[in-house]
């Protein structure tokens, strides 16, 4: 197993981890029922996409 050569400072550790955060996904309201959903996706509740009724079997 590898052994570190030098101790990693708090600053360097923080800089390394600066990109590890989670991002919040955008949500939009459905045009028909108003439920929150991801953009460019059909609504699972009312089966519509851009006010067009989908026939899902």
Swiss-Prot record:
Biological process, per Gene Ontology: translation
SUPFAM superfamilies in UniProt: Zn-binding ribosomal proteins
GO molecular function: structural constituent of ribosome
One Pfam family named in its UniProt record: Ribosomal_L32p
Residues spanning the signal sequence: none
Gene Ontology cellular component terms for the protein in this record: large ribosomal subunit
Residue ranges, annotated region (Disordered): 1-20
Compositional bias ranges of the Basic residues kind: 7-19
Keyword field: Ribonucleoprotein, Ribosomal protein
Family: Belongs to the bacterial ribosomal protein bL32 family.
Entry-linked PANTHER family: 50S RIBOSOMAL PROTEIN L32, LARGE RIBOSOMAL SUBUNIT PROTEIN BL32
NCBIfam families the UniProt entry points to: rpmF_bact (TIGR01031)
Name this polypeptide is given: Large ribosomal subunit protein bL32
Taxonomic path: Bacteria, Bacillati, Mycoplasmatota, Mycoplasmoidales, Mycoplasmoidaceae
